[in-house]
A protein has these predicted regions:
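Compositionally biased, intrinsically disordered low-complexity segments enriched
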Residues: 1-18
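Beta-rich carbohydrate-recognition modules and glycan-binding surfaces
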Residues: 2, 27-205
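Bacterial N-terminal signal peptides
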Residues: 18-26
Length: 205
């Protein structure tokens, strides 16, 4: 019996000592969970590949307007130019389809230069209400020099034909396309050049 009691006491002492030693050594007795790495940024458009997505112009002619926009991809750059006419419309845009998962990202980044007029970037997740597609846009400024502009998803404003609507948050895991608009209420020519469009957040510095 005495031998058995000694063994029990030794086991108890060991059980008490082992956790204490682990704490002193800086080792946790609980399982250590390594956090998952954040998703890497994704390039949506680089304008330097043969299989680059096609960009389509949508003018305000669909509303009886007279604005005219033109788009071309050349020398690794998208160029969106034209003339805005505010009467009976007052907008022109270019859009491209790109199915991509941006879950875990904060927003999109564009490297742009232009004529100083403000533009808008649109991110489409295919959300519709009352049979209409919801447009989610945010303004971007341009200067004559190349500048990098970041647009957080939280800055996107949900509208239908320019009128604000209540809508569910952007479904960042199911992005369907990107658009660029000019609708600043001023007649005249415009120019926008885009070097790239990509996401940021996650591992982006």
């Amino acid at each position: 019996m005495r031998v058995r009691r000694l063994r029990v006491r030794r086991l108890r002492v060991r059980r008490l000592l082992v956790p204490s030693l682990l704490v002193l050594l800086g080792v946790s007795a609980r399982p250590h969970h390594v956090p998952m790495p954040a998703p890497a940024p994704a390039t949506l458009f680089a304008f330097d590949r043969a299989n680059e997505a096609e960009w389509d112009v949508v003018n305000d002619g669909v509303m009886g307007g007279h604005s005219a926009g033109f788009v071309e991809v050349t020398e690794g750059t998208l160029r969106f130019t034209g003339t805005l006419v505010t009467q009976d419309g007052g907008f022109t845009s270019v859009r491209a389809r790109r199915d991509i998962d941006l879950a875990g990202q904060t927003g999109i980044e564009l490297r742009v230069r232009g004529s100083g007029r403000p533009f808008e970037v649109e991110i489409d997740d295919g959300t519709r209400t009352y049979g209409r597609t919801i447009s989610r846009r945010a303004p971007i400024a341009t200067t004559a020099e190349w500048t990098t502009v970041r647009v957080p998803f939280s800055a996107l404003r949900s509208t239908i034909f320019g009128r604000a609507v209540n809508a569910a948050p952007l479904d960042v895991a199911h992005i369907r396309g990107v658009g660029l608009y000019i609708a600043d209420g001023k007649d005249g020519t415009f120019r926008l050049e885009v070097d790239y469009i990509r996401s940021y957040g996650g591992d982006t510095p």
